[in-house]
Regions:
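Mature N-terminal segment immediately following signal peptide/propeptide cleavage
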Residues: 1-23
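Catalytic cores of eukaryotic secretory-pathway lumenal/extracellular enzymes that build
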Residues: 4, 22-25, 41-133
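Zn2+-dependent metallopeptidase catalytic domains
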Residues: 26-31
């Protein structure tokens, strides 16, 4: 088992911004009417926010305040949070996400579950866990 820290450097973030900026949205038949597909104006607003408005560094710092680890299981690297409970002998609580999701679903409730010994894995192929070969 190894300690883990989320560490996206500025170079990685710039590449992400470039990829987001290069996204070409399909033409839609009826803007604002979601019955015919996603509203491309909404998607463009979302892409702009991810490039220029979202504070990726702040989110990284928020997540790194909690202990994270990786371990190797049958050749697959599994990423997980292990947040010890506030009391010795706290009841363990395993929080697992589904598809298509990630541990981020639970990050907001970590502080609310401090009475429990939390284990929150990233399923194989999600977030920082690798896919089986």
């Amino acid at each position: 088992m190894k300690e883990f820290c989320i560490d996206f450097g500025e170079e990685q973030m710039e590449k992400l911004r470039q990829r987001i900026g290069c996204t070409r949205l399909p033409r839609t038949l009826n803007e604002g009417n979601w019955s015919l597909g996603t509203d491309s104006n909404y998607l463009q607003t979302l892409l702009d926010y991810w490039c220029d408005g979202y504070d990726w560094s702040r989110k990284q710092r928020e997540l790194n305040q909690y202990p994270q680890f990786t371990c190797e299981l049958d050749g697959v690297t599994i990423h997980f949070f292990h947040i010890p409970g506030s009391n010795k002998g706290a009841m363990p609580l395993l929080l697992t996400h589904g598809w298509p999701d990630s541990f981020l679903r639970y990050a907001k409730v970590f502080p609310l579950l401090s009475d429990y010994d939390l284990v929150v894995p990233s399923l194989p192929g999600f977030a920082f866990s690798t896919l089986p070969s």
